[in-house]
Amino acid sequence: MCEIIGRKKEIAELKRCYESGRAEFVAVYGRRRVGKTFLIDEVFHDDMVFHHTGLSPYDRRRKVTLKDQLQNFYFSLLRHGMEDIAQPKSWMEAFFLLERFLETCDNGSRQVVFIDELPWMDTARSGFLTALEAFWNGWGNMRHQLLLVVCGSATSWMLDNLINNKGGLYGRLTGEIKLSPFTLKECEEFYQSRGIRMSRYNIMQAYMIMGGIPFYMNFFNPSYSLAQNIDALFFSRNAKLGDEFERLFNSVFDHAEDCMKIIRFLGTRHSGFTRKEIAERTGLNPNGDFTKMLKALMGSDFVVKYTPFGFSQREEHYKLIDSFCWFWLHFKEKKAVKQNDYWQQHLKESDVASWRGIAFEEVCLQHISQIKYALQIGAVSSQESSLIVKGSEEADGMQIDLRIERADDAVNVCEMKFYKAPYVVTKGYAQVLDSRLQALEEKNPAKTFLLTYVGNSDLVSNEYSDIFKASVTLDDLFV
């Protein structure tokens, strides 16, 4: 096994299942390109007796059919040593062939069976799930040496059909792993392992573009600067990620075009929109399929649902949180350019500065535990949210980037700033912050509000900087 960056908890769970001495059924899911296949291959490389990957539904020419999936499964069995017999005509037959094959190569040691991109195999009216249920309930769970690992990027399918299954597979999983993108610290370790020298300032910017997805980071050229790498990946002719946005959605979501329509609309406002606003502005019918699409986008960590502080439950907002999508929509798609040095030429433009502010906030929201650790409140129970206060005739509205409401009745009100140079608090800005504090204290007199600076650069000490009672800077986010 080669060196694996991070993933310590996930590796420990996989090893626990391997060493249990009983039949194990493990589901691994997470965003596409996050490294699920790599993890399983590396951990179980020497013990895998069968490995199969479903065919991607992303085919520009035609839909992938049940016949295609069955033929592909049959060929995988042959490649692993099954005797050459008739090709199965149904999933029931296919899984029966897998049973027979595993019995013939059973030598008493652990048998690891890895089925990758499981949701792709479940084509319309194929009977796939019923056959999988029969395979496990009727045979697999009685084989003490069997370790079945299934993977899927279509997170909503994995959640609905395996993890939260209400039918024959209810409660059958013995292990469940959701694989998340790398943290900033893990990204730093990844780049170092590839011989890529980057400052933490640039690692942060890379994260703001690609969101800690190792598949994208793997394309980096060590001899290029960050800006050169971004041009090579996104903007040059034959860019490696030139069609990644559509490929990503078409390979994961059933209603890919409508899901992309939702994502494009959510990308127009950082704070997000209500369900009603999304339906009205996209022209989509707010029916059951619409609900499933929103659920699928949330399950795959592209979108989050939240109720802004001060709003009613009926005003729940849906917000785009995927860094890659933010960058793609604002630059790759919006600009529609094929210029080899586009990013290098436009780094100092105002729209890039505006995007950086939003993108930095999203990275911080993905590193809440690091922020809490830096504030020495890691062990304190808390709830995190943004804060939007509606304006009225009597008072102005306000928006706060991050609010950490703690069990000890203190609230960290976080202001996030992305500046290359050390940040200087001006007299005018200090007055704005002070008025916000007073408004919050009037509404919540039992709480103690602590203004907290979260930035990639240091906070300059001056006569106004003590408005902030705590600060979190770039190095704190790399813990």
Question: Model-derived features: where do they sit?
Answer:
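Phosphate-binding site recognition
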Residues: 1-346, 350
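A cross-kingdom feature that marks ATP-driven nucleic-acid transaction machinery
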Residues: 309, 316-479
